Amino acid sequence: MNTIPKKNVDLIIPVYNEEEIIKHTHARICAVIDKLPYQFTLYYVNDGSNDRTSTLLNELNDSRINLIELSRNFGHQAALTAGIDASKAEIIISMDGDGQHPPEMLQEMIELVIQGYDIVQTQRIDKYQPSSLKKKTSSLFYKLINKMSNTKIVQGTADFRAMSRQAVDALKEMHEYHGVLRGMIAWTGFSTIILPYQPDERSGGVSKYSLRKMLSLATDAIFSFSLVPLYIGLSFGGLLLFLALAELTYVLSFWIRGETSTLAPGWSSLMFIILIVAGLQMILIGFIGVYIGYIFQEVKRRPVYLVKKD
């Protein structure tokens, strides 16, 4: 009797200093995938951990594990990219190694890809922290990026998603040094379904996503997917030209009426205008500088990540 070959599924799991919970996370994933009729490969991407994360992963002695060791900490997006580049399966699922992405959703995500969706994007629904600073700043980020860019990113989306081989191959064609995967995947336009989920509490360790890293991710997203900052500069320039024309018209009116003697010296107002113009120029030059900096880093063609070889 002919048997139908099992579909191959790759799990991409970036980890960074997760020695406290990595065994628990793996055991929980295995408790789910051991019951599913698919062939799994688990790509753990060690993003330059300086604790025992790598040692503990090797001790798991699971033949399905493929450990990718990065030479240093390149960041979450780079680690995800390393796993995606290494993947070969028909279905690829990325999830975090901190235990907050529930593996119990894997079966539903795989089934949706099999039904024909190229991207199954999860959406974080956090009911227990309605007033947290992280939630408010995250909401502000999504509102800004969706107003400033033609690429729409659903609020609350995470890097917990399933993708078809077609979507992954398209994503791998996008060689961006400052890549923001949730924006790049939305940009591809492949058939997508949103799957809400309630994040689990961390079973140990602390979040590695500091305020600095969140701001860096937001900056990458804004400057990678929008030219609005440049248009803001053009608008300010136009406004200043209009104000300069209005001032010129006002001064000329005194000359026409022969009332130049009534014009005040106006040293303070002149300095005020000079300072405003100079400040705006510095801001706008800064915007241009950021874009040039991004171009500079792209044209150098440095790899997004480096893999350590044994």
Would you name each region that the model predicts?
Residues 8-10, 41:
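Cell-envelope/extracellular polymer assembly enzymes that use nucleotide-activated donors
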Residues 18-33:
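Short, well-formed alpha-helical segments that are part of the catalytic scaffolds
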Residues 70-72, 76-86, 100-184, 200-219:
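Acceptor/aglycone-binding surface of glycosyltransferases and processive sugar-polymer synthases
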Residues 18-21, 49, 102:
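Donor nucleotide-sugar binding loop of glycosyltransferases
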Residues 92:
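Short aromatic/hydrophobic "clamp" motif used to bind/position activated sugar donors
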Residues 46-54, 99-100:
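A conserved acidic beta->alpha catalytic loop
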Residues 1-5, 180-310:
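Hydrophobic helical membrane-anchoring modules
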Residues 40-44, 54-86:
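Conserved donor nucleotide-binding strand/loop of the catalytic core
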